[in-house]
């Protein structure tokens, strides 16, 4: 009996052990299955993030960035930085990416700072290149990643459509030996230089607003003779001007508008009426324009100290109310006029689009030597980030999302575009005019606000507030003055930019620079 009880007890213990072993084995198999499932899901999430425009990374990806900052006030709200602002927070929310800026320089000092890093082979993961020679050096030394597959998998359909709208040449400018090594900024047409005049000075002197350039010169001469903006011990400034006379597609204070009114295109290759390709600086039209500028200088209309001026110095003259005339692009109210308006709301700057019969449409040949590009350091494990960021900022947030209020507010606040990581703009070629047409339609009631893109809606709100109050904010004034007043001039005039033909670095017909 005792032996039977012992056997029975041993059987019970053995059964329990086997039961527990079975449970443990089952739990381990279940845990292994859960682990494999989670691993597979995680790998799938990473794969989706790395191969789609808007896929979110399962873990935060931090990338180092070389950033170009604006020369003036960034207008970022207090407490916000280039690493923590509405753009970076939105990108972290949608993509789970975060930039860490390892160097920041203004446009004037950026190329020099980058060249030092290139020589030292100490490059950030992602950075901007604004000098063609530097880009070619990076390519020759195999220092940047191939982005061909990144563009195919992570560029949204709309972003590809934007690039394709410029023809093959734009993307080809960043392509070397069949590989896309640099993402170019789109060459959005900013329109011609407008003449900005102090209309309050015109009224104060009892003058008539100009209808021609010669009318405008008469007005500026009157500013000079009446010492407008000058203190007792100062000389009046006149028409301020960049020392180089000729500007780029995105700079103010040049004399391009005067050259163009003579049918001249200096420092550019053009096709003349006889069908010949000639250098614009050497044409008869350019000589006539230079003769006009010499006459303006002799009459005291052109700033007598223009040859000694720097961009910042010219900007200070405008902001401090020392001058009442300069040529600038449509966004001039954002920079520098907004800073003057903040100090003196009586300063009534008005743009004028003044053309003459001498102006003619020509075929202009352009290079990409002054273009900006975004590149990725060779060996960085997430090169797709650049295309994802561009797709979110310039497609998803503007056309698809409904949670971009904080970012949209930056447009009305006139936050400098350099607050965006990557610091290039990607948009349709005629985006400037399209936005203004849509805003005006909404203001006039022929388009619903809901039909506007995010950027259009933001400017629409600011312009509507401007029209609805006697004391608009500085930002509302700048939005209306730039988008409606300035661009509106060009829309109403049915402005068409000169036809441009882009050429690559290897173009054998035309030299890249005049030796």
Where are these regions (language model features)?
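Conserved N-terminal structural module of periplasmic/extracytoplasmic solute-binding proteins
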Residues: 23-216, 260, 277-281, 401-403, ...
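Polar, glycine-rich mid-to-C-terminal structural blocks
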Residues: 294, 346-356, 362-440
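C-terminal motif of bacterial Sec signal peptides marking the signal peptidase cleavage site
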Residues: 18-22
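Conserved small-residue motifs centered on glycine
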Residues: 48, 396-514
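Helix-loop-helix "hinge/cap" segment bordering the ligand-binding cleft or interdomain interface
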Residues: 148-153, 175-253, 271-317, 322, ...
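Bacterial N-terminal signal peptides that target proteins for export
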Residues: 1-10
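Glycine-centered hinge/linker elements that transmit conformational signals in sensory
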Residues: 274-303, 350-360, 444-455, 459
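Ligand-binding "clamshell"
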Residues: 136-149, 336-361
């Amino acid at each position: 009996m005792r032996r039977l009880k012992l056997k029975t007890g041993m059987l019970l213990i053995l059964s329990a052990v086997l039961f527990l072993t079975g449970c443990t084995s089952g739990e381990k198999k279940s845990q292994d299955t859960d682990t494999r499932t989670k691993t597979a899901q995680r790998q799938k999430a990473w794969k989706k993030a790395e191969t789609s425009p808007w896929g979110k990374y399962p873990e935060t990806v931090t990338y180092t960035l070389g950033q170009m900052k604006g020369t003036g006030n960034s207008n970022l709200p207090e407490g916000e930085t280039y690493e923590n602002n509405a753009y970076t927070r939105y990108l972290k929310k949608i993509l789970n990416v975060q930039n860490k800026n390892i160097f920041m320089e203004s446009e004037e000092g950026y190329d020099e700072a980058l060249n030092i890093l290139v020589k030292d082979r100490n490059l950030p993961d992602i950075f901007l290149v604004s000098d063609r020679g530097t880009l070619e050096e990076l390519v020759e030394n195999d220092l940047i990643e191939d982005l061909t597959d990144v563009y195919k998998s992570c560029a949204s359909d709309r972003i590809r459509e934007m690039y394709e709208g410029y023809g093959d040449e734009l993307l080809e400018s960043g392509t070397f030996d069949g590989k896309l090594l640099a993402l170019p900024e789109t060459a959005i047409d900013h329109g011609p230089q407008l003449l900005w005049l102090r209309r309050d000075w015109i009224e104060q002197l009892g003058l008539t607003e100009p209808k021609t350039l010669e009318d405008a010169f008469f007005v500026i001469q009157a500013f000079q003779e009446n010492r407008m903006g000058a203190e007792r011990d100062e000389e009046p400034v006149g028409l301020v001007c960049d020392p180089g006379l000729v500007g780029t597609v995105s700079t103010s204070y040049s004399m391009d508008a005067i050259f163009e009114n003579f049918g001249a295109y200096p420092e550019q290759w053009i096709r003349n009426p006889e069908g010949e390709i000639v250098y614009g600086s050497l044409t008869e039209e350019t000589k006539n324009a230079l003769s006009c500028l010499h006459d303006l200088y002799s009459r005291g209309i052109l700033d007598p100290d223009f040859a000694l001026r720097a961009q910042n110095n010219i900007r200070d003259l405008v902001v401090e109310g020392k001058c009442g005339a300069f040529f600038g692009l449509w966004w001039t109210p954002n920079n520098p006029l907004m800073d003057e308006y903040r100090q003196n709301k009586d300063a009534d700057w008005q743009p004028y689009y003044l053309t003459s019969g001498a102006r003619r449409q020509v075929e202009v040949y352009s290079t990409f030597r002054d273009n900006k590009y975004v590149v990725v350091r060779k060996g960085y494990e997430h090169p797709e980030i650049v295309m994802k960021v561009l797709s979110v900022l310039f497609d998803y947030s503007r056309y698809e999302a409904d949670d971009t209020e904080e970012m949209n507010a930056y447009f009305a606040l006139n936050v400098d575009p350099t607050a965006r990581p990557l610091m290039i703009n990607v948009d349709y070629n005629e985006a400037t005019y399209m936005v203004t047409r849509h805003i005006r339609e909404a203001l006039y009631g022929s388009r619903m606000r809901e039909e506007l893109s995010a950027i259009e809606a933001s400017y629409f709100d600011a312009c509507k507030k401007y029209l609805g109050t006697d004391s608009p904010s500085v930002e509302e004034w700048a939005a209306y003055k730039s988008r409606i007043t300035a661009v509106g001039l060009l829309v109403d005039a049915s402005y068409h930019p000169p036809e441009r033909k882009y050429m690559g670095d290897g173009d054998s017909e035309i030299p890249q620079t005049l030796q």
